[in-house]
Amino acid sequence: MPSFDVVSELDKHELTNAVDNAIKELDRRFDLKGKCSFEAKDKSVTLTAEADFMLEQMLDILRSNLVKRKVDSQCMEIKDAYPSGKVVKQDVNFREGIDKDLAKKIVGLIKERKLKVQAAIQGEQVRVTGKKRDDLQEAIALLRGESLGMPLQFTNFRD
């Protein structure tokens, strides 16, 4: 039976490249030079600046560099800014994988449309199986059309 997996993966290498490019752009910006910094740790980035408006500019720089490197900005989870001495810090976490709530929502969407496919939750991914390839492609089109708050990739398509 044909099947495919719905996953939400983050390319860590491209994320690192985007953060490195954002750091280089900070060095070129006269208004932010020496006043702001990015600190990357695994799947999180800490923004440090002297004022709140600088944090907003840094977030815009980070978003634009993520888009250039083709990393979807929907996976960003932006925390609230907090003061730390004379500076203001803000954490940005990058989510990866499909959590149980989103997986249930995906399965519910597929069942609600009464497509001739079955969806099963398998850890951090959803496996969709059906008798015809056309039914699977219809399910992919349905999921691409929905706004679920996380970037979805479709992998392991088998006939």
UniProtKB/Swiss-Prot annotation:
Domain of life: Bacteria
Record-linked InterPro entries: DUF520, UPF0234-like_C, UPF0234_N, YajQ-like_sf
Gene Ontology CC, one term: cytosol
Binding annotation for 3',3'-c-di-GMP 2: 131, 133-134, 159
Keywords, ordered alphabetically: Nucleotide-binding, Virulence
Keyword presence, Nucleotide-binding: yes
Positions of 3',3'-c-di-GMP 1 binding: 33
Free-text disruption phenotype from the record: Disruption of the gene leads to reduced adhesion to monolayers of human bronchial epithelial cells compared to the wild-type. Mutant has reduced persistence in C57BL/6 mice compared to the wild-type strain.
Gene Ontology MF terms: nucleotide binding
Gene3D superfamilies in the cross-refs: 3.30.70.860, YajQ-like, domain 2
Pfam families linked to this entry: DUF520
PANTHER family per the UniProt record, alphabetical: UPF0234 PROTEIN YAJQ
Summary of the function given for this chain in its UniProt record: Cyclic di-GMP effector that significantly contributes to virulence. Binds bis-(3',5')-cyclic diguanylate (cyclic di-GMP or c-di-GMP), an important bacterial second messenger that controls a wide range of cellular processes.
Family: Belongs to the YajQ family.
Protein name (record): Cyclic di-GMP-binding protein PA4395
Native source organism of the sequence: Pseudomonas aeruginosa (strain ATCC 15692 / DSM 22644 / CIP 104116 / JCM 14847 / LMG 12228 / 1C / PRS 101 / PAO1)
